[in-house]
């Protein structure tokens, strides 16, 4: 007898899933969550530069000025610029006598 005839080969029925409760709502919910997580992770990796650039610059725009008169907008811009200028003056070198 050769070795090839002695080797046990699995039949198709042994390869199939033996889970009888695959229609369990918890299993279905876990599968859906897993698939959604995988899709979101792939999209995040593909478009991460666009996504995070939008959040980084989009959140720094400041409050909306829609419906605000132009004079008040200009006053707000001046206040913001003076706050930036005051912050820059913090790093002025001091000369001692």
From Swiss-Prot:
Intervals, Intravirion compartment: 44-97
Positions annotated with a glycan in the UniProt record: 20
Gene3D superfamilies: 6.10.250.1640
Virion surface face residues: 1-22
Coiled coil: none
Chief subcellular location: virion
Site label Essential for channel activity, possibly by being protonated during channel activation, and by forming the channel gate and the selective filter, positions: 37
Tree of life domain: Viruses
Regulation: The M2 protein from most influenza A strains is inhibited by amantadine and rimantadine, resulting in viral uncoating incapacity. Emergence of amantadine-resistant variants is usually rapid.
Alphabetical keyword list: Disulfide bond, Glycoprotein, Host cell membrane, Host membrane, Host-virus interaction, Hydrogen ion transport, Inhibition of host autophagy by virus, Ion channel, Ion transport, Lipoprotein, Membrane, Palmitate, Phosphoprotein, Signal-anchor, Transmembrane, Transmembrane helix, Transport, Viral ion channel, Virion
GO biological process: protein complex oligomerization; symbiont genome entry into host cell via pore formation in plasma membrane; symbiont-mediated suppression of host autophagy
Matches recorded under InterPro entries: Flu_M2 (IPR002089)
Keyword Cell inner membrane in record: no
Chain positions found as Phosphoserine: 64, 82, 93
A single GO molecular function term of this UniProt record: monoatomic ion channel activity
Transmembrane residue ranges: 23-43
Domain remark text: Cytoplasmic tail plays an important role in virion assembly and morphogenesis.
Family: Belongs to the influenza viruses matrix protein M2 family.
Protein name in the entry: Matrix protein 2
Organism placement in taxonomy: Viruses, Riboviria, Orthornavirae, Negarnaviricota, Polyploviricotina
Gene that this sequence comes from: M
């Amino acid at each position: 007898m050769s070795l090839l005839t002695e080797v046990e080969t699995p039949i198709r029925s042994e390869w199939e899933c033996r889970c009888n409760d695959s229609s369990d709502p918890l299993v279905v919910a876990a599968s859906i969550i897993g698939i959604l997580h995988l899709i979101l992770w792939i999209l995040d990796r593909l478009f991460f530069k666009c996504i995070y650039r939008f959040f980084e610059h989009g959140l720094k725009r400041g409050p909306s000025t829609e419906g605000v008169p132009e004079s008040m907008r200009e006053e707000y811009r001046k206040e913001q610029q003076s706050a930036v200028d005051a912050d820059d003056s913090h790093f002025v070198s001091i000369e001692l006598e």
